[in-house]
């Protein structure tokens, strides 16, 4: 699959915010690594690692088991932001996808933050270069509230082809904890609609 969450790290993988704030000196790299474990009913569980690196306005990313299982992708994007109290951050991207699914993918990361609230989203459309019917729009969206710096809770929605349930859009709740440069988020999808899917996400930033 995909997280951003945050998880939402610059790549909105599960467990992090959609965009890494640019608080470092311009010459420094901002790095993040996230590992999300998917516990899906009636199928084999799997892990999805993602990595991102940002320098100044440029964003680089790599993902595995994200757009699809046994599939990798690499990304190049450009970061920008606007606002102060109401902060908007976005990264338009272009990616190459290879493996079980192969194609080209324009995508984006975006977040809107105000006080203790954050709305974050990421999406991509994979143009399957081997089979047109395999083209797919992926989306991950979170809305969260952080009463204190180290805790957040909220809602999440996901559309993916990395795993399947009886629902086209997976929906659920999230609870996240963070300490310094480490964060851990639990996502529970589809409780009350079908057998729940759980995602456990551990992220590091450097």
Question: Where in the sequence are the language-model features?
Answer:
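Boundary at the C-terminal end of the N-terminal hydrophobic targeting segment
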Residues: 9-13
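Bacterial N-terminal signal peptides
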Residues: 1-7
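Outer-membrane beta-barrel transmembrane domain signature
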Residues: 16-22, 27, 32-34, 39-44, ...
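N-terminal carbohydrate-binding/catalytic regions of secreted carbohydrate-active enzymes
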Residues: 61-62
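Glycine/small-residue-rich loop that forms an oxyanion/phosphate-binding "nest" at active or ligand-binding sites
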Residues: 72-96
């Amino acid at each position: 699959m995909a997280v951003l969450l945050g998880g939402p790290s610059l790549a909105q993988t599960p467990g992090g915010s959609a965009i890494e704030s640019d608080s470092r000196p311009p010459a420094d790299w901002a790095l993040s690594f996230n590992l999300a474990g998917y516990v899906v009913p009636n199928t084999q569980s799997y892990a999805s690692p993602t990595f991102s690196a940002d320098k100044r306005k440029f964003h680089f990313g790599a993902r595995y088991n994200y757009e699809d299982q046994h599939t990798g992708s690499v990304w190049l994007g450009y970061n920008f932001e606007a606002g102060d109290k109401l902060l908007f951050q976005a990264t338009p991207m272009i990616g190459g996808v290879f493996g079980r699914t192969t194609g080209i993918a324009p995508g984006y990361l975006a977040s809107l933050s105000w006080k203790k609230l954050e709305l974050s989203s990421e999406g991509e459309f994979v143009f399957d270069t081997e089979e047109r019917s395999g083209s797919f729009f992926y989306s991950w969206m979170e809305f969260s509230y952080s009463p204190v710096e180290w805790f957040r809770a909220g809602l999440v929605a996901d559309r993916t082809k990395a795993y399947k349930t009886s629902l086209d859009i997976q929906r659920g709740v999230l609870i996240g904890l963070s300490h310094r440069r480490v964060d851990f988020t639990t996502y529970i999808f589809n409780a009350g609609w079908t057998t729940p899917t759980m995602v456990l996400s551990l992220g590091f930033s450097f």
